[in-house]
Each structure stands twice: as structure tokens, then as C-alpha cells.
Design a protein with these regions (language model features):
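Glycine-rich Rossmann-fold phosphate-binding loop(s) that bind the pyrophosphate
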Residues: 65-66, 163
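N-terminal Rossmann-fold NAD(P) dinucleotide-binding loop
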Residues: 69
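Extreme N-terminal leader/targeting segments of oxidoreductases
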Residues: 23-60, 75-84, 527-529, 533, ...
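Active-site-proximal substrate-binding core of FAD-dependent oxidoreductases
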Residues: 375-381, 393, 397-442, 560-562, ...
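FAD-binding beta-loop-beta segment adjacent to the flavin cofactor pocket
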Residues: 348-379, 503-514, 527-542, 549
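N-terminal FAD cofactor-binding segment of flavoenzymes
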Residues: 90-140
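Iron-sulfur cluster-binding cysteine motifs and their immediate structural context
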Residues: 533-563, 571-594
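Predominantly flavin-linked oxidoreductase catalytic cores and closely associated redox partners
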Residues: 164, 168, 173-336, 375, ...
Length: 597
């Protein structure tokens, strides 16, 4: 173990092993955090030089097999079948890390694959038949009339889907066109040429042991080089985060805002199922000061997706998003759906919520950001996959034209210059004030004024508010524990409500135990002085997978990282009040393996 002060400490962290929770020893440096924090690249620790990476060359390298990345790949081959295109996916399979509601606006798929409705085997099996909006109180609910909702909130013509299955279907389309897709390979490093332009990415090394040294099964990562590189990692992607910082892509933009979305998939009794029903709600249990909402989506085969979103600009460090979700299911208007049912799956993922004014500059030398890496979610609609598809198509069209003109590794500024004139710009511009109004004025007045603002944008094409600012980051929004009261949450009953560890088991999450911890604490002393002593350890609550614990050892509080439980939601990277936790990819193919999510 490499420790700057030669004082390693051992702490023990539970890991998931089949259906058992065993305990794995992790070694930390006293007062400094995980030893692996000082070894972001194994080459820094190894006494022996690592072998050179092998490389492969393509016209376009795409990071992330989500809706944006796969749509970009398909579009590139549609425009020019001779282009060589590769897609890297860190999940064990395409769709393994995809988590969404999801009610999909098909406009993006219509543009990409116009004849998809005539095909057999497409994943759009359940069209929305009923659209409901509920305001929940502690004991009752009020259904808001549909005629009062802005037209853009209407879900008729949309489809309830598993977005993971949509991505699997898109991957088949891409491969049929000649796209190479490599699941199980995490893009761990951006590669640059001598002029500082992006020329591709390198996959992570495999077989690095937890001390940072190459083990017996060590395999060097691969370089994938391209004339252009598209980053479609999803929300808070590790490479996108680096590129935004390196090229100052967030300059003159509002800070990005986020939510944490937690979802379960249930098999319910036939009498409790209404295929095509979409039900959105807000209010209880979050109250009127904390932003968020919830959904029930009735899919095919008597399955129901239930989800809960908490805006991550909440102030109270004692708030526990997972427990708020469990409480939500006990509401009289909600619990009946699940009586006699069985929970099938569980997962969680951060959501971009900053909208129009938080979208970073998309282009950089050698490539561009697409999809949720750029933040194209329409917050009030709770939809972003249609914009992800369109962004992938836009980027593909511009890169295909650039390559045809003999260009390579320059900045495709046309992507940045034109996205606001596409359907994405229209979609985000008209809802740009909903999130800041909600954040500043609360669920009651904020939501009402946000609805009014959507109506004025719909009818007159303008907003009385102009373009509002978000202000603080989500990390800065958290207040010291002394300013708040603890929240008592009921114990789970194991039938309708559950604990985190039994929930994580249903995500099929797995990580090799003998590897460096992929959740890096930059300063362990700061974590104790501030995160614990000032904020009462919010990481133990905001994480939906129980990754973080403060445990007493030898009379001292020690920060324990149960990295094996991580579902890759990225909440810690976003909400830690000191930005002291950094999420980096573990070995490729690890993390959750979501099915039908």
C-alpha cells in the first residue's frame, strides 16, 4: 500500500456476493483517504513499465451505447456506409446501465428510423392511453385537470418503454449497418495530439489489484483513435466532466442542475393493472420546499414502473431520497397498485435538470458532447431520450460532412452553432424557467408560475421572466446539519417498502473486489471535518445503494466505502458539499446489469 505518511489503516466494507453480503477489507491511508486516490493511473505505482497499448483506428469513436451514441452511429452509417464507427459501452451489455422511466416521445426515433412502426420486434409495445397528474397530500390527493396542463405535457402519442430494451434494439440496428460495438469496455482516458485536440480514448486497464499494482490477470487497455470523438456517457460522465473543465465548455453557462431518480419495476395483479396509464404526482412526502416528483407507468404484461425523483438542490442534509421513495409508495392513492404484487428490479440514476441555460458548449477540438452528457432533458416533461437521439443525428450529420471534406481533429463548431435551431432548442427553450422558478419559490407557487410560463411560451412564444438563473450548484445548496432537524423514517415492511441492501441485490450490481476503489476521496481529513461534523454525513443518505458509511473504530469515526454496492448513479460526485468525492470508472463490464429498466 502506498501511503504518504506510511500509516495505512484497514477498514471493512460489505460487498455483494450472490445473495450474501460478506465483508471485504479495503486499505486507506490514515488521514488521506483511499490509497488508490494517489494512483489514478496504475503506471504511477508499478515498478515495472507497463506495455504499450495496442491501438485501432476509426473515422468516429463514440463513448456510450445510450440513445445518443447509438443514434449517432446509425446516422453516420446511413449517411456514408463506408465510414468506420465504433461504440464503447462500459456496461456488461448494451442496456445494462440504462435506467429511465420511461415515457418516450417518438419524434427522435421517427426521424432516425422512419419505418420502425411497420417492423416486428420493436420495443415500443405500450402506447399511452391515459394521462393523470396528481397533487399528493399526507392522506389524500387531488387530480389536476388535463385541460389546465400546457399542451407539451400531454403524453398521448408517446410510448411507455424500457429504455434499456430500446438501446438493445438500436444496437442491433447499428450492428446491422456495420457499426462495431464493444460492451464491457470503459473509456477511462481521453487521448490528445500534440496540438491538444482529442484524437480518441483509451479503455481502462483490467486486472489492476486494489493496491494499484498489475495482478496476474493484468491486461493493458486499448487505444481507440478517431478523426472525431463523440462523448455520450450520460449524466455526469467522467470523460465529459474532464473535457468540460479542460476546454472551459461551461463558460458563460449556468451551473448544471441534477436530480436523483430511483426506480422499481413491479409485477402486479391483473386487477391493479391498466396498460397505457401514465400517472405523475408531486407534493407529499417531499412537501412544498423540496423539489421532486413521482411516476407510475403501466407497461405490458402486468408490469408497472414506479419511480421517484428528488431534486439535488435540497437543503436538509438529513433528507434521505431512498426512504422518501419508500414512503411515497405507502400513500393511499399509490399503495393499492402494488397490493399482492412482487418487486422485480431496482435501480437509480442521476438526471440532468439544468435545461437550456445550463447546456455547455457542445464542440471541442476533435469532437463533441451529445445526449445527457450535454444535458438535454426537458424537466417538466421528464423526457430526454428524444433529444438525445436528435443530438446524435445532428452530430453525425456534421461529422460525416466534415470527414467528406477531408477534415479531422478540428473543432466541429457547426454542432454547437446549430443545436439551438433544432427541435432540441425549441423543446428546452420553452421550459427554461420551470426549474429555477420551482427552486426559488417552492412546489406551490413555483410550479404554478412554471405552468403559466409554459403556457405563455406555447401561446405567444415568449416568457415574462426572460431567462432565469439557477444560482448555486447542488453541492452548494446543502446547509449545515445544525440548521435542520433529523427526519424519522419508518422501518421497511419487506412487502411494499424495503431497505437499500435488499434493493441493490435486485440491480444485479457486481464489482471485482480486488481492484482500486473507483470512488476517490480527495481529502479524508476534510471529509471528516466537514461532511461528517458539519453536515452529519449526508453521503450515508443521498446514496441510493448504501455505498458510504461512517463507522466507529478505535474510538474514531472512519469513512467506509462499500464500492461493490455502487449502481453508478453519480449522486456522490454531484452532491458532496465539498466536491471531495470523485467517481471514476471501475473495470469495464462491472456495475449494475439492469433488465427491462
Amino acid at each position: 500500500v502506498l501511503c504518504a505518511n506510511d500509516k495505512p489503516e484497514d477498514v471493512f466494507a460489505p460487498r455483494q456476493a450472490g445473495s450474501l453480503l460478506t465483508r471485504q477489507k479495503q486499505t486507506y491511508c490514515a488521514g488521506e483517504g483511499p490509497a488508490s486516490e494517489f494512483a489514478m493511473d496504475a503506471q504511477d505505482l508499478s515498478a515495472n513499465p507497463l506495455p504499450e497499448r495496442e491501438s485501432m483506428e476509426f473515422d468516429v469513436v463514440i463513448v456510450g451505447a445510450g440513445p445518443a451514441g447509438l443514434s449517432a452511429a446509425i446516422r453516420l452509417k446511413q449517411v456514408n456506409p463506408d465510414l468506420t464507427v465504433v461504440v464503447l459501452e462500459k456496461g456488461a451489455e448494451v442496456g445494462a446501465h440504462i435506467l429511465s422511466g420511461a415515457v418516450v416521445d417518438p419524434s427522435g426515433i421517427d426521424a432516425l428510423l422512419p419505418g420502425w412502426r411497420e417492423e416486428e420486434g420493436h420495443p415500443f409495445k405500450t402506447e399511452v392511453t391515459d394521462d393523470q397528474f396528481l397533487l399528493l397530500g399526507p392522506a389524500g390527493s387531488i387530480r389536476l385537470p388535463n385541460f389546465a396542463m400546457p399542451p407539451l405535457m400531454n403524453n398521448h402519442g408517446n410510448y411507455i418503454v424500457s429504455l434499456g430494451n430500446v438501446c438493445r434494439w438500436l444496437a442491433e440496428k447499428a450492428e446491422a449497418l456495420g457499426v462495431e460495438i464493444y460492451p464491457g469496455f470503459a473509456a477511462a482516458e481521453v487521448l490528445y495530439n500534440d496540438q491538444g485536440a482529442v484524437i480518441g480514448v483509451a479503455t481502462g486497464d483490467m486486472g489492476i489489484e486494489k493496491n494499484g499494482e498489475p495482478g496476474p490477470a493484468y491486461t493493458r487497455g486499448m487505444e481507440l483513435l478517431g478523426k472525431y470523438t463523440l462523448i455520450g456517457e450520460g449524466v455526469r460522465g467522467s470523460l465529459a466532466k474532464q473535457l468540460i473543465a479542460k476546454f472551459d465548455l461551461a463558460k458563460d453557462r449556468e451551473p448544471q442542475k441534477y436530480g436523483i431518480g430511483i426506480k422499481e419495476l413491479w409485477q402486479v395483479k391483473p386487477e391493479n393493472h391498466r396498460q397505457g396509464l401514465v400517472q405523475h404526482s408531486f407534493g407529499w412526502p417531499l412537501g412544498m420546499k423540496t423539489g421532486g416528483g413521482s411516476f407510475l407507468y403501466h407497461l405490458e404484461d402486468n408490469t408497472v414502473a414506479v419511480g421517484f425523483v428528488v431534486h439535488l438542490n435540497y437543503k436538509n442534509p438529513y433528507l434521505y431520497p431512498f426512504e422518501e421513495f419508500q414512503r411515497f409508495k405507502t400513500h393511499p392513492a399509490i399503495r393499492g397498485t402494488f397490493e399482492g404484487g412482487k418487486r422485480l428490479s431496482y435501480g437509480a440514476r442521476a438526471i440532468t435538470e439544468g435545461g437550456y441555460q445550463s447546456v455547455p458548449k457542445l464542440s471541442f477540438p476533435g469532437g463533441a458532447l451529445i445526449g445527457c452528457s450535454a444535458g438535454f432533458v426537458n424537466v417538466p416533461r421528464i423526457k430526454g431520450s428524444h433529444n438525445a437521439v436528435i443530438s446524435g443525428m445532428l452530430a453525425a450529420d456534421k461529422l460525416a460532412a466534415a470527414i467528406a471534406a477531408g477534415r479531422a481533429s478540428d473543432e466541429p463548431v457547426e454542432i454547437e452553432n446549430e443545436w439551438r435551431q433544432t427541435a432540441i432548442g425549441t423543446d428546452l427553450r420553452r421550459v427554461r424557467n420551470v426549474k429555477p422558478l420551482w427552486s426559488k419559490l417552492g412546489t406551490g407557487l413555483g410550479v404554478a408560475l412554471g405552468g403559466l410560463d409554459m403556457w405563455t411560451n406555447q401561446l405567444f412564444g415568449f416568457s415574462f421572466f426572460g431567462t432565469l438563473k439557477h444560482g448555486k450548484t447542488d453541492a452548494q445548496s446543502l446547509e449545515p446539519a445544525a440548521q435542520h432537524k433529523k427526519i424519522d423514517y419508518p422501518k421497511p415492511d419487506g412487502v411494499l417498502t424495503f431497505d437499500r441492501l435488499s434493493s441493490v441485490f435486485l440491480s444485479n450490481t457486481n464489482h471485482e473486489e480486488d481492484q482500486p476503489v473507483h470512488l476517490k476521496v480527495k481529502d479524508m481529513d476534510l471529509q471528516k471535518r466537514s461532511e461528517l461534523e458539519v453536515y452529519a454525513g449526508p453521503s450515508t443518505r443521498y446514496c441510493p445503494a448504501g455505498v458510504y458509511e461512517w463507522v466507529e473504530k478505535n474510538g474514531e469515526e472512519v469513512f467506509v466505502i462499500n464500492a461493490q454496492n455502487c449502481v453508478h448513479c453519480k449522486t456522490c460526485d454531484i452532491k458532496d458539499p465539498n466536491q471531495n468525492i470523485v467517481w471514476v470508472p471501475p473495470q469495464g463490464g462491472e456495475g449494475p446489469v439492469y433488465q427491462n429498466m
